[in-house]
Amino acid sequence: MAGGRYNSGCVTAENVVVVPPVQPNFKSHFTDILRDALDDRGLADLNLDIEFARPRQASHGDYSCNLAMQLAKPLRQKPRDIAQSLAVALAASPYLEKVEIAGAGFINLFLTTSAKQQFSRYVLESGEKFGHSNMGAGEKIQVEFVSANPTGPLHVGHGRGAAFGASLANVLAAAGYSVTREYYINDAGRQMDILALSTWLRYLELNGVAPDFPPNAYQGEYVRDMARLIHKAHAGRYVHKPELLFEEVAEVEVGTEAALDGLIANAKKLLGQDYAYIHNFALNEQLGDCRNDLMEFGVTFATWFSEQSLFDSGGVAQAVHLLEEGNYLYQQDGANWFRSTDFGDEKDRVVQRENGQLTYFASDIAYDLNKFSRGLHRVIDIWGADHR
């Protein structure tokens, strides 16, 4: 053709239409066959659930159905006789190699080799998208998991929670949900004060000051490691006379929680603003180790939510105020109690102690209130034994 251009039918990127792989839905196909069989027998009004289970033993086929046993009572027939009739209808499927009747009337279905190959092709063509769907349609779900106190290394129980939580979050994301993975940092309570005190006491030991170490403080080698880091960076900057630390505490029995609280109060008084440095150093060291362990484990979080931020923002005070307005609190023995038994709990819970100190339960309520203020459709909490 003069001045023209001959096209021999070459395929280019512009004229290729990519056809997504089509998933063979065997269960839906078999359900349609059985529905038609019921319709032919005038049984459509029964509206039974037709379910297919995966047999535990390969010798029982690829799918098993108990529809015949569901029909036995309304039809007043033996399940095996009904199963035989249904098996005839199923045998017409091009996906089935054979259909067997087993036991009291189970219908066992065996797929053909070509049907299995068809599904294998679908898996290969789907690639990384295999198993994904849009079932969640972008619904916002938050999964909070692990959330171990940052007062020491993670243990096997935390690893179990991490594996379970991360797997669940991945499955939900693959199903089309908008998933937020969140770790709640308990950085505002007494346990963090105990960690700070423990670290400081080990630091004093490195400076030649060796006060008696409380038996109910944190004993792990990781506490000594943190003390060494502080000593290496600051030498004797945070040293104070140990006798001042034990003022008024000596009268309290050693090893009691009251004695430990007295040491914490004295440490805060002696260190002043430096106490915040010891506290935050210990917190950040433990959180850093936690993050690294989880990352090596293949677990990451979009949000690390600080409990302390709820106090700083007034979130805890707001939550307690809302409970008071709703008449969900009452006073007893000088403490404020939440009527949790009204909601199925085994006992009511203290939200504010007689000394005015708010409990973990109060900040947990504030945390849940914060979660639902973010526009989440659903919240999933995965707790370990230390959260009970």
Question: Which residues does each predicted region cover?
Answer:
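NTP-dependent nucleotidyl-transfer catalytic core
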Residues: G9, D45-C65, Q70, Q77-R388
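Charged, compositionally biased N-terminal leader segments and the immediate start
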Residues: C10-F52
